[in-house]
Amino acid sequence: MNLFYNLGISLYSAAVGIAATRNNKARLMKAGQAQTFGILAEKVDTSASYIWIHVSSLGEFEQGRPLMEMIKKHTPEKKILLTFFSPSGYEVRKDYPLADVVCYLPMDKPSLVRRFLDAVKIEKAFFVKYEFWGNYLSELKRRGVPTYIISAIFRPTQAFFKWYGATFRRMLGCYDMLFVQDEESRALLAGIGVDNVVVAGDTRFDRVTDILEDHTDLPVVESFSRGAFTLFVGSSWQPDEDFIIPYFNKHPEMKMVLAPHEISEDRISGILTGLKRPAVRYTKTTPEEAAEADCLIIDCYGILSKSYRFATVAYVGGGFGVGIHNINEAAVYGIPVVFGPKYGKFKEARDLIALEGAFTVSGGDEYALVMNRLLSDGEYLKKHGEFAGGYIRDNLGATRRIYDAIFK
């Protein structure tokens, strides 16, 4: 990569180091990257080759996961190296059983890149969705390692398509194949001369069908929601709750499960203060107590996606911040999904709105209009839920298309 790119990486690395003195996420990243080469020395089988899957965070992990599962299903002898950029992915999935080695990806500095690739014999490399690291890509190409990006999605606003984007366009030339989510991405790439592109779809759809088939017993959630119109609020933030909770307080004909994105005693306490109806916490209640409550607060991680099967309607948070969280996990159950206005980067959100399987709201007034109709009109509720579930079913198969193109 050129001098300016490498300077940018060095400045970013320095910024992480400074932030680590006061920010826990940066602290975890810095400490985790410092452990990477020790993990590789301890766990890598130097006589074997590895399929390398790199993801940024937890959401991208869920896109890479179906491919890892398919690789292990058909070729269990293959070894997988899984790397993360963000602590929010690594800290949750560092013990993922299908990966033989899991670690942080070192910063994209030439010396670290060479050291990393010298430590592991890479058979094939897969980057997921948005991961474009110029030094890794150019070094993989120089070494002749087949390299792919999966579930990628491109937008006209990205640097690849700007007059100043030559450095970033060169990165695209390092991929043997780009598997994109939609035709719009393929057309954008064709416009800059990139034609080794396959419209395969989004592997996350295949992941959510696995969730659909997971019948883990959740007696507290099941007992709480039985026979009631139950709104599930997933991965909520304060701006979401500012209008969801007041509406809930005024509508005794509904129940609510609320799962905040960040769980802390302060967050839970604030939610409980705002609620004017009986509420219980998931970790501190029984099925019998939950059945008598009006609101169930999910104060632990790992059960939200499985819990949506008990929902009547889902609201997915994040739409008043950096962007909405995973809406497919709810839509797969054939229920309408509601979210805030910052959804433009997410193809599935745009598609679901166009198909009327989802609704976007910009505040409390619009939210009330949507919820009033869903609460009062059973046929309307059923119809829009069917639109959501049908969209998920129609978009299955990306993992198989990618696997067959590379491994068959």
PLM segments and residue spans:
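Active-site and donor-binding regions of nucleotide-sugar-utilizing enzymes
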Residues: 17, 21-214, 232, 237-238, ...
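Nucleotide-activated donor-binding/catalytic signature segment of Leloir-type glycosyltransferases, i.e.
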Residues: 93, 97-101, 269-298
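Acidic donor-binding loop of glycosyltransferase active sites
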Residues: 120-124, 291-322
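Structural loop-to-beta junction motif characteristic of Rossmann-like glycosyltransferase folds
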Residues: 145-146, 312-313, 332-341, 357
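Short alpha-helical segment that forms part of, or immediately flanks, the ligand-binding pocket
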Residues: 305, 328-332, 350
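A short, well-ordered alpha-helix in the C-terminal region of glycosyltransferases
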Residues: 380-394
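C-terminal alpha-helical cap of glycosyltransferases
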Residues: 395-408
